[in-house]
């Protein structure tokens, strides 16, 4: 997971991480392994017509007034870095804590996770909203998730969790990335229905369209998958995900590493029927890659046509191919996404089908078969000149294992390498590990690398409409010691969020951010006077000119 961890949990034995034999970690790793890390529209599904050509991003708007990048006589200084965590719903790994909670309980738990994100100085959250052919919103394409309702009958919980989650994330100035598993249809038994159609919700699409379903692997750990090689199944899962894009004000569409399933020894994915019908003489491995490529390309194009400001990104397995297999590959010796799960991640970047990529580098620095310090530069070189942002998937779940992961500084050191190589963000797996803070590792890297707030890095391919310079008109201390500002909007496009700077020596540093409409404050102004400036940002993170200074 984000299906990621499961992804790594399914590595071949030579890359399987060592396990610390404590009850907590055993439970986490078990859950990770399981990850593999409304009514339907009609009984017969007709795929939609091809998506129109993607809308091109308009040229950047240059607003008038204010100063660009300066607070009075000094430059402003802000870190541009995506910071987030995966909030995993399948098997109730992170959230909700158990199935069948009341609306009030679910909401309270979610708000605590957002409080954690704010305390970590994150600016995004990645929420698992389609874990297994189900939904955390009222959907015409999928049953309600049993991990939310506690039932497998598809009945509504009577409220809309997605609307609540998006609104509350935005209220805290967190981007909301909706995390989907496109092809996974069920979880294995005994907790999930496995490959037993009789245990599916009555409105599960695979019950209506059994020709779309493939069971894999054989035996007790079987799941049902939407067949990636069936064009009607592919169109359906695209429509199911785009329903959420259409209905909700999300900031990103996010996939993890699960496309074709990770291979089981001695068992090939049983897609003979669709290969015979649609393969058209293409070698099966290439045909499978083509199927996944088509999903990725079509999702990119359809998101652009529907809401061009919504980001599209994928968090793949951390190895594309090994150099021993392909000279373009990485200096590694592990499972290969290209060959083993038919995910040509390198191609997706080079073709510009993604806005960001989050490779799961869940190995330690110095690990011989997959060295973090060697894989990181491979990925940074891949994205150069493409416009695709590189964020790294960090393996917080491994902290506390034997060996290198018993060092609380392991992720701290990895983030130092990320900064050295110009990585533009990190996403941590998973939320529960950040809350538990084993060995104090999370506190350590937060204090070293996330000590100050950060702005989301803008993307040139997205629409740009930076607002005009706002105004700081007054400031006063409240009873809690915060400095509260009175502001006025600038001219031109409306700001989506704000950034507050305070002059410190020869620069003005970022001290706080917030959503437009929220109170502008400096939470720790100190006892003496200070000089401040304010800016507005558009939806894509483009900053407008800075206000005139206000000294208080």
Predicted regions: what is each one?
Residues 445-492, 541-552:
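Pro/Thr/Ser/Gly-rich low-complexity, intrinsically disordered linker/stalk tracts
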Residues 80, 88-108, 178, 183-243, ...:
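Active-site-adjacent "subsite" loops/lids of carbohydrate-active enzymes
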């Amino acid at each position: 997971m984000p299906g990621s961890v499961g992804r790594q949990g399914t590595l071949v034995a030579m890359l399987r991480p060592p396990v610390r034999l404590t009850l907590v970690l055993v439970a986490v790793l078990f859950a990770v392994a399981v990850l593999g890390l409304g009514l339907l529209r009609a009984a017969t599904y007709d795929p939609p017509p091809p998506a129109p050509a993607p809308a091109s991003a308009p040229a950047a708007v240059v607003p008038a007034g204010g100063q660009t990048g300066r607070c009075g006589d000094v430059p402003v200084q802000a870190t541009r870095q995506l910071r987030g965590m995966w909030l995993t719903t399948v098997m109730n790994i992170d959230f909700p804590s158990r199935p069948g909670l009341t609306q009030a309980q679910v909401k309270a738990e979610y708000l605590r996770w957002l409080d954690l994100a704010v305390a970590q100085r994150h600016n995004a959250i990645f929420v698992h909203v389609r874990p297994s052919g189900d939904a955390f919103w009222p959907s015409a394409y999928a049953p309600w998730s049993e991990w939310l309702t506690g039932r497998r009958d598809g009945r509504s919980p009577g409220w809309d969790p997605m609307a609540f989650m998006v609104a509350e994330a935005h209220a805290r100035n967190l981007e909301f990335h909706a995390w989907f598993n496109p092809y996974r249809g069920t979880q294995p038994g005994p907790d999930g229905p496995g490959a037993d159609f009789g245990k599916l919700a009555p409105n599960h699409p695979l019950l209506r369209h059994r020709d779309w379903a493939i069971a894999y692997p054989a035996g007790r750990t079987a799941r049902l998958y939407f067949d990636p090689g069936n064009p009607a199944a592919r169109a359906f899962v695209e429509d199911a995900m785009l329903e959420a894009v259409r209905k909700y004000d999300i900031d990103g569409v996010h996939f993890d590493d699960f496309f074709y399933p990770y291979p089981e020894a001695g068992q090939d994915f049983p897609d003979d029927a669709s290969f015979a019908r649609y393969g058209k003489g293409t070698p099966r491995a290439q045909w499978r890659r083509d199927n996944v490529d088509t999903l990725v390309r079509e999702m990119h194009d359809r998101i652009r046509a529907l809401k061009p400001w919504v980001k599209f990104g994928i968090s793949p397995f951390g190895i594309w191919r090994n150099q021993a297999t392909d000279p373009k590959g990485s200096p590694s010796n592990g499972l290969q996404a290209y060959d083993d799960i038919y995910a040509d991640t390198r191609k997706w970047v080079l073709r510009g089908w993604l806005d960001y990529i989050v490779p799961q580098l869940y190995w330690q620095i110095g690990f011989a078969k997959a060295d973090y310090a060697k894989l990181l530069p491979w990925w940074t070189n891949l994205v150069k000149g493409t416009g695709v942002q590189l964020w790294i998937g960090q393996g917080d779940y491994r902290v506390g294992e034997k060996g290198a992961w018993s060092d609380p500084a392991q992720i701290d050191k990895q983030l130092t390498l990320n900064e050295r190589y110009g990585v533009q963000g990190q996403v941590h797996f998973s939320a529960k590990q950040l809350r538990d803070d084993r060995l104090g590792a999370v506190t350590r890297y937060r204090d070293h690398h996330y000590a100050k707030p950060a702005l989301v890095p803008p993307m040139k391919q997205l629409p740009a409409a930076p607002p005009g310079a706002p105004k700081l008109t007054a400031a006063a201390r409240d009873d809690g010691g915060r400095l509260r500002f009175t502001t006025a909007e600038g001219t031109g496009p409306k700001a989506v969020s704000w950034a507050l700077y305070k002059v410190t020596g020869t620069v003005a540093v970022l001290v706080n951010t917030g959503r437009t409409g929220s109170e502008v404050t400096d939470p720790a102004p100190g006892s003496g006077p200070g000089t401040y400036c304010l800016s507005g940002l558009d939806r894509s993170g483009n900053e407008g000119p800075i206000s005139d200074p206000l000294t208080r």
